[in-house]
Amino acid sequence: MKRILALVLAALTAVVLLASCGGSAKYIVLEDNFGAEEYAIGFRKDDYALAAKVQEILDEMSSDGTAGKISETWFGNKDAFLTGKEFPRAMQTVDGDNSLQYVLDKGTLVLGLDESFPPMGYRDSKTGEVVGFDIDLAKEVATRLGVELVIQPINWDAKELELNGKNIDLIWNGMSITDERTANMFLSKPYVANAQIIIVPEGSAIKTRADLAGKKVALQRGSSALEAVQADEETYNAILNGGEIVEFDDNITAYLDLKSGRVDAFVVDKVVGEWIIKNN
């Protein structure tokens, strides 16, 4: 998997270098989008003790300025880390909840992520290490918890299976809060604001969601981008009327297809999409 992603990232770099010779196409974010949302960390549905402790540490990091420094490193803005938010679902105390002790006893906190989701968590093509905003936050949480952080790349479409099967302890990777996820997991307080945006080549005839009718639209399989498009029934049905929703395992590959002209538009998290445009 690591080798495949490395090849994909290398291919993306090659595309960008080729495009820079003789005038490269530019890509823009449309003002119209599929709505605002927020990111949260996902825990197993009844792992309240672990969730409470991780949130307590994050609140401490917010108060002592650590979260702000990490935010400034990745976003150039200390205020990108949200404060004053509430849990999407009420915190509870459950008899027999040993979720925190389970992590402390094994000495590791296993973080599940899609390793191609910059700048939240992604594999650096130069060092081979997984880095990102979420990774830096999680490293500090693990240090204060007194355990080792283990980063476990997963198939994003199977994230809940990985979580409930105890292959990972939490999902921490720019995961958008949705009603379905709130019902199936226990979510932390929101910590980053986001939106589902539309990216197109500069000069494209696509100016709004309505213009996606009959077009090929790229997005990540199992993502909140897909959920957002499907939730907008009018736009979704218009796309399928002569067009196609093209699903990819990761956002980098989806972006490659946009650059190659195989799709007409790319729907993706604002945080990720803006990073891709800025860095490529």
Predicted feature locations:
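A bilobed periplasmic-binding-protein/Venus flytrap-type ligand-binding module shared by bacterial periplasmic
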Residues: 37-56, 196-208
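Hydrophobic residues within well-ordered alpha-helices
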Residues: 41, 54, 141, 163-164, ...
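Extracytoplasmic small-molecule ligand-binding "clamshell" domains
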Residues: 50-53, 60-74, 93-174, 247
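Sec-dependent N-terminal signal peptides of Gram-positive bacterial secreted proteins and lipoproteins
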Residues: 2-22
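Acidic, polar ligand-binding/catalytic clefts
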Residues: 26-33, 135, 139, 143, ...
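Short loop->beta-strand "edge-of-pocket" segments that line small-molecule binding or catalytic clefts
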Residues: 108-113, 210-227
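A ligand-binding cleft/hinge motif common to bilobed small-molecule-binding domains
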Residues: 19-35, 158-161, 174-183, 228-231, ...
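Ligand-binding clefts/hinges and TM-proximal coupling segments of bilobed small-molecule sensing domains
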Residues: 33-35, 56-98, 224-245, 278-280
